[in-house]
Curated annotation (Swiss-Prot):
GO terms for cellular component: cytosol. GTP binds at residues 19-26, 81-85, 136-139. It is found in: Cytoplasm. It is an enzyme of class 3 (hydrolase). The keyword Membrane does not apply. Monomer. HAMAP family: EF_Tu_B. GTP hydrolase that promotes the GTP-dependent binding of aminoacyl-tRNA to the A-site of ribosomes during protein biosynthesis. Mg(2+) binds at residue 26. It comes from Synechococcus sp. (strain JA-2-3B'a(2-13)) (Cyanobacteria bacterium Yellowstone B-Prime). Residues 19-26 are annotated as: G1. Residues 81-84 are annotated as: G3. This is Elongation factor Tu.
Length: 409
C-alpha cells in the first residue's frame, strides 16, 4: 500500500504530557484524541492503546513512549506520552521526543507531588520552552477554595523553577469525565458538555500559549564534521549532516572545536555526487573549503555560521546513568571518573569533577539507574551549547546520556 503523503498545511508543534504518576496524563491524552476525533482532526485512541506504548531505543536506551497525532484549527501536533516515570526522565534527557511545549497534568485532589516537581525541573533543564497546566480530577474536589489553593501551589512551583508562574494558563477539568462523555457519544461537539468543553479550552491554551518553534532551517547554520577527504586540484571536503540552518556556496563559515577556531569560505557543495546551490537542515552534504588542508579538519569539529557557537571544556549537565539491564555499568562510579563524552560525531575524554543530587547534596558515588547533575571537564575544547545532548561511553558502550544545562568555561 502506498504511503499517504504528509500534507504540510499547518505549522507543526511537538508537545507531551508530563506530571506525577496517576495524575491522569494518559487519560488526558486519550480525552484529547477522542474529543478532536469528533471534528475529524484526530484518530480516537483508547487509554490501553496509549498505555501499551512500544519500546523504542534512543542512544542505546530503551524508552517506552506513545506517540499520537492530532490537529486543531491552527496547528498539527505530535504528542508524546510516557507510561513510566523512568521513561520520562530518559526521554527528556536523551531528547528522544523533543518537546516544543508540554501539558503539565496535576491532580486537583492531590496537588503537586514529587514527580510534578521533578518533571518541572527537568523541563526547565532540558529546555522545554513553555508549559500549560491541566488541573485534572476537578470533579473530585467540591470546595472551590481548595481548587484555588492547588492552583496557587502550582503557580508557585512553576515560578520557583523559572517558568512564568503568574502567566501560565491553568485549565481545570476532568479528563475521565470528558472521555466518558465522548465514549458514550463520539459525536459530542463543543458547547454540548461542560467537561468536553474543558478539553477544547485546554487546546485553545496550547494553541495560543505555546509558541510555534523556529524551524531548524531558520536557525544559524551548523554541521558536525563526520569525514574529511581531499580532491586533487580542488581542495578539502568535509562531509556531514546539516543539523540546522542553511548554507550557500560563497558563504563564510567557522571551523570550531578541537583547535583554534578559524574561518573559511565554502567554495562548493555536493549531495549524492551532484552539485548543490544550497544545503538545508537535514541534508547530508560535502562542503568544499577554501585554503584548508586535509590535516586541519577532523571529525568532531563543526562548521558553523561565524560567531554562533564557541568551543568549551567545562559544563554542568543533567545525566541519566544506564542500569545494568540497559547495557550500562554494573558498578557505581565516583568523582574523578574519566569516561568518553560522545558529542555529535566524536568521543572526547572528560573528567567528572563533582555530582549534585536534586536536593543539593553531593553524593560520594553514582549508581546505575541514577539521575544526577554532574560537572564535567573535557580534555579538548569542542563546540558546546546549552541544551545540547551527549552520551557518556566507556569502552565503546553507552553508560549514560546527558544534556548540557550550563556552560562554565
Amino acid at each position: 500500500m502506498a504511503r499517504a503523503k504528509f500534507e504540510r498545511t499547518k505549522p507543526h508543534v511537538n508537545v507531551g504530557t508530563i506530571g506525577h504518576v496517576d495524575h491522569g496524563k494518559t487519560t488526558l491524552t486519550a480525552a484529547i484524541t477522542t474529543t478532536l476525533a469528533a471534528l475529524g482532526q484526530a484518530t480516537a485512541k483508547r487509554y490501553d492503546e496509549i498505555d501499551a506504548a512500544p519500546e523504542e531505543k534512543a542512544r542505546g536506551i530503551t524508552i517506552n513512549t506513545a506517540h499520537v497525532e492530532y490537529q486543531t484549527a491552527n496547528r498539527h501536533y505530535a504528542h508524546v506520552d510516557c507510561p513510566g516515570h523512568a521513561d520520562y526522565v530518559k526521554n527528556m534527557i536523551t531528547g528522544a521526543a523533543q518537546m516544543d511545549g508540554a501539558i503539565l497534568v496535576v491532580s486537583a485532589a492531590d496537588g503537586p507531588m514529587p514527580q510534578t516537581r521533578e518533571h518541572i525541573l527537568l523541563a526547565r533543564q532540558v529546555g522545554v520552552p513553555s508549559l500549560v497546566v491541566f488541573l485534572n480530577k476537578a470533579d473530585m474536589v467540591d470546595d472551590p477554595e481548595l481548587l484555588e489553593l492547588v492552583e496557587l501551589e502550582v503557580r508557585e512551583l512553576l515560578s520557583k523553577y523559572d517558568f512564568p508562574g503568574d502567566d501560565v494558563p491553568i485549565i481545570r477539568g476532568s479528563a475521565l469525565k470528558a472521555l466518558e462523555r465522548m465514549t458514550a457519544n463520539p459525536k459530542t461537539q463543543r458547547g454540548e458538555d461542560p467537561w468536553v468543553d474543558k478539553i477544547y479550552e485546554l487546546m485553545d491554551a496550547v494553541d495560543s500559549y505555546i509558541p510555534t518553534p523556529e524551524r531548524d532551517v531558520d536557525k544559524p547554520f551548523l554541521m558536525a564534521v563526520e569525514d574529511v577527504f581531499s580532491i586533487t586540484g580542488r581542495g578539502t571536503v568535509a562531509t556531514g549532516r546539516i543539523e540546522r540552518g542553511r548554507i550557500k556556496v560563497g558563504e563564510t563559515v567557522e571551523l570550531v572545536g578541537l583547535r583554534e577556531t578559524r574561518s573559511t569560505t565554502v567554495t562548493g557543495l555536493e549531495m549524492f555526487q551532484k552539485t548543490l546551490d544550497e544545503g538545508i537542515a537535514g541534508d547530508n552534504v560535502g562542503v568544499l573549503l577554501r585554503g584548508i588542508q586535509k590535516n586541519e579538519v577532523e571529525r568532531g569539529m563543526v562548521l558553523a555560521k561565524p560567531k554562533t557557537i564557541t568551543p568549551h571544556t567545562n559544563f554542568e549537565s543533567e545525566v541519566y546513568v544506564l542500569k545494568k539491564e540497559e547495557g550500562g555499568r554494573h558498578t557505581p562510579f565516583f568523582a574523578g571518573y574519566r569516561p568518553q563524552f560522545y558529542v555529535r560525531t566524536t568521543d572526547v575524554t572528560g573528567t567528572i569533577s563533582s555530582f549534585t543530587a536534586d536536593d543539593g547534596s553531593q553524593p560520594e558515588m553514582v549508581m546505575p539507574g541514577d539521575r544526577v547533575k554532574m560537572t564535567v571537564e573535557l580534555i579538548q575544547p569542542i563546540a558546546i551549547e546549552q541544551g545540547m545532548r551527549f552520551a557518556i561511553r566507556e569502552g565503546g558502550r553507552t553508560v549514560g546520556a546527558g544534556v548540557v544545562s550550563k556552560i562554565l568555561k
